[in-house]
Swiss-Prot record:
Disulfide links within the chain: C15-C21
Signal peptide: none
Function summary: Thanks to its single linear amphipathic alpha-helix, may integrate into membrane phospholipids, leading to lysis of the membrane. Shows antibacterial activity against both Gram-positive and Gram-negative bacteria and against the fungus C.albicans. Has no hemolytic activity.
Tissues expressing the protein: Expressed by the skin dorsal glands.
Keyword hit for Glycosyltransferase: no
One GO cellular component, as annotated: extracellular region
Name recorded for this polypeptide: Nigrocin-2
Lineage, top ranks: Eukaryota, Metazoa, Chordata, Craniata, Vertebrata
Organism: Pelophylax nigromaculatus
Length: 21
C-alpha cells in the first residue's frame, strides 16, 4: 500500500544519504 511505498522510498533515501549501500 501507500505506507509500504513511503517506507521503501525512505529506505532508499537513508541508504543514499548515509552511504551504507
Amino acid at each position: 500500500g501507500l505506507l509500504s511505498k513511503v517506507l521503501g522510498v525512505g529506505k532508499k533515501v537513508l541508504c543514499g544519504v548515509s552511504g551504507l549501500c
